[in-house]
């Protein structure tokens, strides 16, 4: 190692110091000054951990003054190099740059430059980088991209709808599933896919004010999508950053009332150019042909300006035909322009439904049914399919022929592409509800306080008095003070304590209307019996609620009881529990359904017990009996409840306010009759055809099977743990499928993407993640994995390595060079390039003669035979064979050209095949189904042309390389 003053070297152990200059020499030591980091280092001359920096012809080097030189010749004189070449800014030729004037901040971006400069990575980092490239490639190509990473059970109809809609260009659809079937999750899955595929970058969600937090939590917990709630206060704050506050965030959540009441904010929202608009509870938007409501006009204005629109609404039958038409008008006003024409067209779908029902049942088709199908599919020859169905062919062939006919008929179904609707009746897997009504005597303390309250509270409106009478404990506290212990004598509390003691192993969810009741109940359980309980109410932050929910979910040492207030429990689901206690009752049937829906959801494994303790002779008894006998709302979902309530509310409020229940039997009888009639109408209006289409049948099951197979991916676990190790995260295995990940002091970057400052508990198991809301569900799509991979790539981790191969069959010193190339098409994400040509790794294994052995030498098995080399020795090995490495890279560059051409051709072929078949299908359908929008066809046509250009220009570059040297010891 010969040093000379002015030479440039780089430290092998501290590469972040920059480029060093030899400033002093004596017999035994050498001093280097690193000007970029203002540090000096003194090393022993005979064994300094530094590498000489030499650039080659073709490299571009930077001068300290900031200009760059393309090297055409390298001259050495007295141990110092001078680079001759052309300046890139002025194009002046024959410029000489002495090495002492090279920029101190020089960075080695090419992997071979890093290798020559001694900046050699650990072998396991090289392996991690290659695996990251390979896995990213496979994830991008997967047809299930965007569906695997959400924290939700694998429920066929939800996944089918998300898969159908999420891949469309600017989807405009109506999601009208019945309550408890997970419309919010379907919408979230569609949003998630649109975001991952680059189709939607700016998203606006408009919901009723009470549901804002529920949406915020669901999007964050289930899909790792961080929305910002916008209200007047937030808009005023954001005004400092931008004239239009809506431009300050990509994902915005706001209430319809906020936009309805402020014309200024509505106009700003209109100007903000969204890619996707999501509207929840869209059935509350009132419309009539001559007088649409303000709320409807707000949504209509946004829907006209936004390419993608998702409307979440109650079932069409609950809405009524005209109201249902009004929702469809928001999606496509050209198509749904006239209500009368819509009604007439709907009537024509009856024969389609009959034909499909006949095909579904598998019975022999009558001539009439065949004629109907032939007429409906007039543009294609269906005779061969009929022949297969009626022949002696095997069952599978018959099923395929039937399915083809069904698919073709479905496509022609008027609203099949814009409307998805599932019912509990059409979807199996819901638990039975066991109802336990428990009448209890009213304590004398309550009787007294209620009588006094009635005497002095004469000014209250009937509705307010009715509400007040439902909560006798509050009336008692008005007289006895906030601190009075009503829970010492209330028989509902005594009953609850006995129940909890009798069923120690069962998790119990208790819901009370008020936060104060919930808090006092927790105190009662703790003080009277030492029962482990936790509370959940609207006064708590999202993080506090998460902790409470996690404590309740915990198997070992968790809370036996979770006590929720009405608002606090919105949007939270506790499917792992099956015992529900309603400590009091809500005022309206929708809230009752929402309470039961905390446990009675798709995915609940057991039947659920609903316990309703109520005080006899009080408003509670009136309500309990009306819900039970008038609506049967405890035992079954009650889509008609609200309508019945609106009809009988005056009599009901009168009884609740007065405490008299003489007319109760009559009101119950009237309600039951009305309920039956409404339910019969709903059943009559059910669109069987739409249900068949919405639940996805066999196709939905296949999607579930595919995602379930990916769920057990052990590759992901080992990859994630190596990734966290490399970046410098602490990992602590907590058992029960949980690992705690926290930032360390030795991290590669100051903060890790997707990881909170205090760390996070993660799990790779979907079921664990579903029962423990405090855990992150880690999948290939999770920001912690995606962000970690981006970090590896951008920080150049693992781009060059040196390994030893102990193999006595080969001569000592035999060289192999592993080259990893990446083929890349520079294209915007929204173009859809990722589906056909994502960043594609190509691996070559060059022997010393320049032959590629990658076909015979598989990466993982070969990697297991290699051992790492320390950086200093690696640097010496590289220096001794630098010319060979140069030669082999040139040979690799020539060899890889053929691979790149093959990859381009395959991508072109797949893209043409996939998009052209979709285009032809839509064009053929356009002739028979007006629901195909021109924009959709034009978008696919433009996409094909665009992608053709991008794919043909795809380039390759050397991403990483590994030198392998054979040794025998």
Swiss-Prot record:
Family annotation (Gene3D superfamilies): 2.30.30.140, 2.30.30.930, 3.30.360.80, 6.10.140.1500, 6.10.140.2230, P-loop containing nucleotide triphosphate hydrolases (3.40.50.300), Tandem AAA-ATPase domain (3.40.50.10810)
Keyword entries, A-Z: Activator, ATP-binding, DNA-binding, Helicase, Hydrolase, Nucleotide-binding, Transcription, Transcription regulation
Keyword tRNA processing appears in the UniProt entry: no
UniProt motif (DEAH box) ranges: 280-283
Keyword DNA-binding: yes
Function recorded in the entry: Transcription regulator that activates transcription by stimulating RNA polymerase (RNAP) recycling in case of stress conditions such as supercoiled DNA or high salt concentrations. Probably acts by releasing the RNAP, when it is trapped or immobilized on tightly supercoiled DNA. Does not activate transcription on linear DNA. Probably not involved in DNA repair.
Protein name, per record: RNA polymerase-associated protein RapA
Protein encoded by which gene: rapA
